[in-house]
Amino acid sequence: MERIQENDPIIKSADESKESPAETLSSIFKRPKIKSSSLNKAYLGKAGSVNGASNTSTNQISSLKVDVSSPPSTAPGSAGSTPKTTPVSLNAGVPPSNTGANITTNSNNNAQTISSSSQSVGHIDNPSGLGTHGKVRLSIKLSTGGSGGSSVTGKRTAPGNPWAIRSAERLASNPTSIGTSSPESIDNNSNNKKSAPSLYAAAAASAARHSMSAAYASFTGTVYDSNGNVIKGLDTSSSLSSSSHPSHEALSTIDTKNLQALAASAAPSSCRQQPVDEERQDRVSKISKHFQDSGTPVSEEVSPTRLPSPTSARRASHLSEGKWDEIDDEDDDDWGSTIEFEDGTTVVIDAKTRRYEPVKRQDTLASNHVPSAPSNESVSSAAPSKIPVPEEASINEHSNITDEAVSLPEPVYPNAPTSAVSVHNPTISDEAEPTERAFLKKEKPQISKEKKNPNVTHEEFVEKSTALPRHINKVEIVSDSSESFAHKNNEKRFDKEASGRINDLRAEQQQIMLEARQKAIERRRNEEEELARSRERARKKAEEIKISSSKMNSSPTITNERSSNVESSKKVEAIYTKEPQSITNSPEGLHSNQETTEIDPSSPRDDSTPLSWRSHSHPIPPVQVSPLFTSDKNDPLQLNPQSDDSTSSPKHGKSRSIDEVILSIKDVIFDNNLYKQRSYQSGVAANAHLPHRVPNEHGGVSRIGNSNALGQPVSSSSSYSHSKGRDTRSSSYVVSSETSSLKSSRLILSHANSVRIQRSKGDVILNLHLPKVNPERFLPTKSLKLEEMKPLEEKVPIYRSSSKQPLRIHPTHPLRVTVCLPGSKTIQVARRSFRNSMNANRYDPQRRERIDSGLWRAKN
């Protein structure tokens, strides 16, 4: 076992320990607030728990550096700071079982001879060093290197600060760290962890780390629980003290499983020294056995009530160490069974190792309960019935010992080790519940078997459950348990019966679902048929419109144009929708699609129907973008395809309304831009840069009048988007009779050579072909040449603000750059939109600098 470093915390005089509020060990011991380890060390160690400590080498003890001497001794480990240790007078008549061996603790300043009994008391000799002295004045100074008084005792903070205790333990958990529970001492401990071994003398000093105490115990032969409590000195000082590491002997005596469990539990507990834990475990097991064998209470002076509740102390320590998972997962016995009172002896089960013969007994009980509890069937019922009994027994068993013992049963021992060794551990001998223990032993295999076979058939389960209650009755556990088993069995049978009903219900449910599905299919089929009928009606209506439009084409009316547009759009739609519609799954849909193909030119857009939208992902057919064309009213395909007029497909008003809403929004934007464009293009001068067009023959018809552009197709480079405007929009234009023949042409040239985009209902297709010429536009903010627009296009991120980069063109200029593309519309980037647009995520600081500085404007 690694020896505690010389700079171990020194148990200081009580005067020094005053630094912490309930510094006196008595106050500490009074309540579990004090780390149970230190208290238990002091108290439990009193009764020969120090046995075998007497022979511990002085070095070991000195490493503990228990300065029993009440005068504050500054341990070098304490960095010369004399921690004030609460003078703890342990009124534990510590039988000098190992008194013969007085250990001189070399607190670097004070070499105190600590009688092994004093050591047992908490490794703290009476200041007088009388091992036999019933009262031990524990003045623990944990020399945490710097933790002067704070290291007084891990327990020093224990009175009210379990966290501090735990943290002190954690610090002390490093063998070098001094386990002072006080936060200050914790900090100091952390600083001095390596300098000062954790002296869980806290039992005596109420601050010794459990591992420290374990190490010290291994030296002194005193066994300390994880809390540093003296579990028990070995019966003979020689047993522990015979070797500086009596733990080896203890190990031999200790159950291997116990050692393993102790080591396992100790390891999870914050960095507890495995060797220390093992030795402590050995000692603990030895001591526990010794207690059970001797049946002698550790010290009559130590009233269990005064002992810190190991449960609370451990809980606090676990809390501070984040050990709750360990507690809950590994064993709640850690709390409940911490103090094992066998034969009236007070045994503190190491919270860390949690492997103690008495604990094991409870663990076995718990384990028996636990396996049964997991099985939710009759076994589970048995488990609850059994669990209360062992708990009660344990409570009764220990209730005489301490109230804390009663509180201990709180853990259900869910994870208590169920090892047969622990079950049969002789130390378990507990007169209070031999029958229960025997029953558990007998029952355990059965319970585990049932637990293993939770999936057995109901009959088997019923049999097992019935057998289990029978066995319980034999064992005479509790009639209630047997009754509960019978009740459980009845429930199981009922469940079995109910299972059939449940299956019936399930089948019925499935049947209902199938029927509902069929009904849904039928309903869908009916809907599709209705859609097909409505499509047919729309088709007929479209044919009528087609006929009427063909008749009206001769008349120069916007209506004719609209009808021709509708016709062309229908034709295009038929072309586009024929293929996707054929994909529709419903036979009606296929039929309608076939019909659509038959009536291609006049077929209404199937896309407008919800079914078609479901059938294919492109409800709106692709739009043909044709270069500006000579107005040929008879060539409808030159027109941009248009969605049906609401009149053409009245049955699809809803879907059309969706399209129209979108298009109307686009149209509104587009129209506003056109108006602005017209206002900006206030004359031929402004438009002189536009691609050359034949002057409008009817230039005087109206400012925006349609001009005759026959034979003058605009070059595709300057072909402007042909977007379909709303009918109301087209009516806003003054149409000369001369240009009525041009109505089929969507793009109408104004007398000013500006292009007016007349749009009937339909998608707004905006193809902006920037002319190769460099027109100037007089914008509200700035006159911007088109050549400048290239940089602007490159600087799109400037004009498109992303959520990440708000737009800032220039502090003086609001973001209002209106670019009038020649002849088509003004592109007005007037909106600080934060939607992610092109290159939205791209940010060029230099570019932004240029922009902000207005360098790009300088180009103008």
UniProtKB/Swiss-Prot annotation:
Predominant subcellular localization, coarse grouping: cytoplasm
Q: Where is this region: Disordered?
A: 1-31, 46-192, 265-339, 357-464, 481-656, 691-735
Chain intervals with Acidic residues compositional bias: 326-339
Kindly indicate whether the keyword Cytoplasm belongs to this entry: yes
Post-translational modification Phosphoserine, affected residues = S69, S70, S81, S303, S309, S555, S603, S649, S655, S657
Enumerate the UniProt keywords alphabetically. Answer: Cytoplasm, Phosphoprotein
Question: Where is there biased composition of kind Low complexity?
Answer: 69-83
Quote the subcellular location field of this record: Cytoplasm
Q: Would you indicate the residue range of the signal peptide?
A: none
Its protein name is: Uncharacterized protein C1604.12
Q: Which organism is it from?
A: Schizosaccharomyces pombe (strain 972 / ATCC 24843) (Fission yeast)
